[in-house]
Amino acid sequence: MGRRYFGTDGIRGTVGDAPITPDFVLRLGYAAGKVLAGSADVAAGSRPTVLIGKDTRVSGYMLEAALEAGFSAAGVDVMLAGPMPTPGVAYLTRALRLSAGVVISASHNPYHDNGIKFFSADGNKLPDDTEAAIEAWLEKPLECAASDGLGKARRLDDAAGRYIEFCKSTFPAAFNLRGLKLVIDCAHGAAYQIAPHVFHELGADVIPIGVAPNGFNINDGVGATAPDALVRAVRANHADLGIALDGDADRLQVVDAAGRLYNGDELLYVLVKDRIVTDGKVEGAVGTLMTNLAVEVALQREGVKFVRAAVGDRYVLEQLREHGWQLGAEGSGHILSLDRHSTGDGIVSALLVLAALKRSGRTLAQMLDGVTLFPQKLINVRMKPGADWKGSASIRAAIDAAEAALAGSGRVLIRASGTEPVLRVMVEAQQAADAVRHAETIADAVRAATT
């Protein structure tokens, strides 16, 4: 049976609309607390403790209070971290030997959205069976613990400082950032206090932007999903590099001194090349169905195997574990380096990139010399609900014709949206005109067959 509430990245929606309402979130805290209290990992007679962190959305106060009440009613203690990047919650949960971590965030979405995601005691996203158990408890009545069994809540002292030190520990001790001018865009989000300190304490001259959250401006014209602000700031300040995080700081985009933007696909290649230097060999790396073909070809030239996961950092992580590899990424800027952290971390990923540049003595453009991303054309085609696009001979013929024409110099990817009756048509080719032409031909075939 499919999950009713949990998606690939927790539970998310518009604040005030189900399920992101205070009454549901209170019950969610209670349900999660009951699952934790019944876990075999909780010693007899002890009380589970969870950590709650959040980004800077105004709704975070309300949802934090609701979660806290739900956990307390289930007999679970709560530590409150305040504004904290998603990977910071994952780290602190693991480092403090807590039962679970909870993040209140909708990542790169606008302020009127919010969400809840959970981490297990080891700093990983919850397994499917645990999420299913929480959903089962959501169907049961809320029975508050007796007064002597209620959970307690307290603020976690120096949560930010602990995470700052962790981030710095991932940067080679032999290196520092002295002499580098960096623009750090925190998207008015969870890392607004933390990220500038990390880079400053490692010696960089830091120019922070997106560090004035007001509850409503998270991701608004700033951050990893709106990198134009970073490009302008890098050029205006004659900076060496710019780093943009998103609202919960689990992804990044990088801009060089010339104003060129580098996405997760390109940064993955840079990190693999650096790891070959430090480790002598990298067996393989993981991208997604959307990873640019040029990166796959370039990695294979280096003798590195490449596996494509479904879109979503959760699936990249699954493939990394299955193959026993360390490095994976999405073009959106989610980068995983499992020997550094259990989850994607924008700050740590930025430090890995900076370490690679320090080690090589080269710029990003130089490290990517010979890797030219293939142009991509993406068209979203709205269909009639329930339309059988897979069974259409005309759509199949259009796809086959495009693949035959590209013949190894490009690719076609067709994906149905998981939330609306939309078919995503993506064509990648060495020439932009070819990508556009083939994508439009397939899109026309989809429209004719499904609308």
UniProtKB/Swiss-Prot annotation:
Domain of life: Bacteria
Modified residues (Phosphoserine): S107
EC number: 5.4.2.10
Key words, A-Z: Isomerase, Magnesium, Metal-binding, Phosphoprotein
Known function: Catalyzes the conversion of glucosamine-6-phosphate to glucosamine-1-phosphate.
Family: Belongs to the phosphohexose mutase family.
Reactions this protein catalyses: alpha-D-glucosamine 1-phosphate = D-glucosamine 6-phosphate
One GO MF term attached to the UniProt entry: magnesium ion binding
Record keyword Isomerase present: yes
Keyword DNA repair in record: no
PROSITE patterns, per database record: PGM_PMM
Gene Ontology cellular component terms for the protein in this record: cytosol
Name of the protein in question: Phosphoglucosamine mutase
GO biological process, one term: carbohydrate metabolic process
Required cofactor(s): Mg(2+)
Residues forming the catalytic site: S107
Post-translation changes: Activated by phosphorylation.
Cofactor details (free text): Binds 1 Mg(2+) ion per subunit.
Annotated Mg(2+) binding sites: S107, D246, D248, D250
